[in-house]
Structures are given as structure tokens and as C-alpha cells.
């Protein structure tokens, strides 16, 4: 999965993208509702000389949660401390991070749904009262002391908000749903990134890259860099529509932003399971992918684009999925040969 050109997750080759990230809300493209709310909340907090209330970003990976955390830290003139749920293994790890913060700092916890429950409970007084409760000693001699913490902002990010416990979720003052980007928004992101990379690109080519980026800025920037490589070798370095299409076709990212694995999922449902319904476990076993990977990585985009439907009985291919392969349901029933073998 990590080697997919259209994986929404951060990979080693994406490190150059850090320089492409906006640093202010004004520079940030997309997520209009989230951006508008954050703009008001940040201005209100600064007007009252208070830290920003705690924020939870949830949604598919690659949509800008970490970027917004950086922007919030910049806007609040605080430092950003970044960690993740799996990285905090002991209560002492979290205590060390919390006591190192200063006023207006931002603590960003990625994959916050993977925090150990016992560690999670340490966050409750930290979020509510800016306090850290420490137990000294053991048994009957144990006693609890409370340390004051600076006025910091906790930003949590998760791709699976349903796995958060209610006590933790309820302590966030702002819950922000991150949505897939429109093709037009991604075009603007590609144009902006190309300018930073000193690459000449026409808007038609930028739109083509954006259209095939699965609604995800991280993928758009990754594809831009690969198209840049292609045009440096095959063209004069400038990216036009013809060069963009040729590069993306060579990368096997089709006009809908689907790659070989996406098409494999659709082919399996249509040609091997008669269009569905098929259970997620069965589908995962058939195509050789982890169940969580299908549910968290592939499905959101396929559902959002209308290729598959999630039903109580399993996954069902839509008419759009059949059209994608140029077949109708009747033709598929007349010829049940898997196109895996073609």
C-alpha cells in the first residue's frame, strides 16, 4: 500500500512537500467551513489573551490535519509539539511532553484514537483544568499531587473518530470534519505548489492533475512532482496538458484517480461476486489486502465517487462502476469470467 502513487498516507518521498505547506489560514486552500470557524476562534482567543480551545480534526488521511495544526501554532505564536497515539507508550511519556509546554503552545497528537486508555485519562485534567495529576508512592502510602500546566492547545487528529471514547471526544471544544477537496481547489493547490517549485504549468494541466488526485492535496503534490520529472525528460520542462496526461497515464492513475488496486476491488465485486453484496472480510481476503486498509484507505474515495455502496449485507458495485469498465449488469451476468485473467 505504501508504494501506491495515490496512497493518502505520508511516505518517504513526500518529505519535500513540507516546504509546500501554507503557514497561514489566508494561504490555506479548501476546507472552507473549517477554515472560517478556525479564523473566528483564533481571533477571539487572541483578543481575550487566551489559548485556543482544544481541536479535533477527523477524516481521511492526507487532507491537511497536520498542516492546520502548524497554522494554528503559527497564528497563536506558540510552538508545535508533534507526537502520535502509538508513540506515547507510558504515562511518563505524556507527562514529560505536557510539562515541557509553555503558554499558547500546541500539542498535536496524530492517530489519537490509538492512545492507551490509561494514558488517555491523564489528558482529562490536562484538557479541562490545565493540570497534571501525579501519583507518588505505592499502596496505602501512595498520594496524589497536582501540577499546574501552561495554557496550551491540544489538537487531535484521527481517521477513525468512531473509535474515540466519549470522555475524550467530549473534551474537545471544536470538532472539525475534514472533507475531500474539489477538483478546482486541487487545481489551485497544484498551481501554488508549482510556483514554489519554480515549475511552469498551465491551468489545464494543473486541473488534470487535481482531477486525478482523489480529492487529496498530498496526492496532488506527489503527482505534480512525478509529472514534473516526466516533463523535464520528455518535454522542455514546462508542464502542458498533453505532458500531464501522458505522465499520469504512465503512472497508471486513470481519469477518475483510480489505480490498479482500486480497479482490482471494483473488478472483484463486479466480475467475481456478481456485483455484490460481498462482505468486507471476504473482499479483503480475495484481493489480498488488510480489512482495515480497505475500510480506511480505499473505501472512502470509492464511496465518495459513487463507485460502490455500503449496505448491511456488504459492498455493492454501482452503475457507475459498471460503466467504468464499459459493461452493463446484464453483460456481466452473461459473462462471469474474471477480467483478472484477461
UniProtKB/Swiss-Prot annotation:
Catalytic function, reaction form: ATP + H2O = ADP + phosphate + H(+)
Residues holding ATP: 20-21, 62, 65-67, 128-130, 171, 181, 218
Spans annotated as Large ATPase domain (RuvB-L): 1-181
Predominant localisation class: cytoplasm
Source superkingdom: Bacteria
Region Small ATPAse domain (RuvB-S): start-end pairs: 182-252
SMART domains: AAA (SM00382)
GO biological process, one term: DNA repair
EC number: 3.6.4.-
Keyword DNA repair: yes
Places the protein is found: Cytoplasm
UniProt function note: The RuvA-RuvB-RuvC complex processes Holliday junction (HJ) DNA during genetic recombination and DNA repair, while the RuvA-RuvB complex plays an important role in the rescue of blocked DNA replication forks via replication fork reversal (RFR). RuvA specifically binds to HJ cruciform DNA, conferring on it an open structure. The RuvB hexamer acts as an ATP-dependent pump, pulling dsDNA into and through the RuvAB complex. RuvB forms 2 homohexamers on either side of HJ DNA bound by 1 or 2 RuvA tetramers; 4 subunits per hexamer contact DNA at a time.
Record's subunit section: Homohexamer. Forms an RuvA(8)-RuvB(12)-Holliday junction (HJ) complex. HJ DNA is sandwiched between 2 RuvA tetramers; dsDNA enters through RuvA and exits via RuvB. An RuvB hexamer assembles on each DNA strand where it exits the tetramer. Each RuvB hexamer is contacted by two RuvA subunits (via domain III) on 2 adjacent RuvB subunits; this complex drives branch migration. In the full resolvosome a probable DNA-RuvA(4)-RuvB(12)-RuvC(2) complex forms which resolves the HJ.
Domain notes: Has 3 domains, the large (RuvB-L) and small ATPase (RuvB-S) domains and the C-terminal head (RuvB-H) domain. The head domain binds DNA, while the ATPase domains jointly bind ATP, ADP or are empty depending on the state of the subunit in the translocation cycle. During a single DNA translocation step the structure of each domain remains the same, but their relative positions change.
Protein name per its UniProtKB record: Holliday junction branch migration complex subunit RuvB
Record organism: Clostridium botulinum (strain Hall / ATCC 3502 / NCTC 13319 / Type A)
Gene: ruvB
Amino acid at each position: 500500500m505504501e508504494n501506491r502513487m495515490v496512497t493518502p498516507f505520508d511516505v518517504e518521498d513526500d518529505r519535500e512537500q513540507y516546504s509546500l505547506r501554507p503557514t497561514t489560514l489566508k494561504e490555506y486552500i479548501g476546507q472552507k467551513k473549517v477554515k472560517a470557524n478556525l479564523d473566528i476562534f483564533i481571533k477571539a482567543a487572541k483578543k481575550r489573551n487566551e489559548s485556543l480551545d482544544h481541536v479535533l480534526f477527523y477524516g481521511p488521511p492526507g487532507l491537511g490535519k497536520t498542516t492546520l495544526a502548524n497554522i494554528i501554532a503559527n497564528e497563536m505564536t506558540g510552538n508545535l509539539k508533534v507526537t502520535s497515539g502509538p508513540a506515547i507508550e507510558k504515562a511518563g511519556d505524556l507527562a514529560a511532553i505536557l510539562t515541557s509546554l509553555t503558554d499558547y503552545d500546541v500539542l498535536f497528537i496524530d492517530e489519537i484514537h490509538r492512545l492507551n486508555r490509561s494514558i488517555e485519562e491523564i489528558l482529562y485534567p490536562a484538557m479541562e483544568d490545565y493540570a497534571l495529576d501525579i501519583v507518588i508512592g505505592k499502596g496505602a502510602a501512595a498520594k496524589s499531587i497536582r501540577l499546574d500546566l501552561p495554557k496550551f492547545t491540544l489538537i487531535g487528529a484521527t481517521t477513525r473518530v468512531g473509535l474515540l471514547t466519549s470522555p475524550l471526544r467530549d473534551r474537545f471544544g471544536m470538532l472539525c470534519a475534514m472533507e475531500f477537496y474539489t477538483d478546482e481547489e486541487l487545481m489551485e493547490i497544484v498551481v501554488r505548489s508549482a510556483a514554489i517549485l519554480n515549475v511552469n504549468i498551465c491551468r489545464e494541466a494543473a486541473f488534470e492533475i487535481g482531477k486525478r488526485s482523489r480529492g487529496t492535496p498530498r496526492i496532488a503534490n506527489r503527482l505534480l512532482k512525478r509529472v514534473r520529472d516526466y516533463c523535464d525528460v520528455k518535454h522542455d520542462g514546462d508542464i502542458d496538458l498533453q505532458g500531464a496526461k501522458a505522465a499520469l497515464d504512465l503512472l497508471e492513475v486513470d481519469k477518475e484517480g483510480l489505480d490498479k488496486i482500486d480497479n482490482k476491488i471494483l473488478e472483484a465485486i463486479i466480475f467475481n461476486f456478481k456485483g455484490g453484496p460481498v462482505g468486507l472480510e471476504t473482499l479483503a481476503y480475495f484481493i489480498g489486502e488488510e480489512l482495515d486498509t480497505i475500510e480506511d484507505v480505499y473505501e472512502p474515495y470509492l464511496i465518495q465517487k459513487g463507485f460502490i455502496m455500503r449496505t448491511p449485507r456488504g459492498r455493492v458495485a454501482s452503475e457507475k462502476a459498471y460503466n467504468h469498465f464499459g459493461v452493463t449488469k446484464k453483460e456481466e451476468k452473461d459473462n462471469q469470467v474474471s477480467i483478472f485473467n484477461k
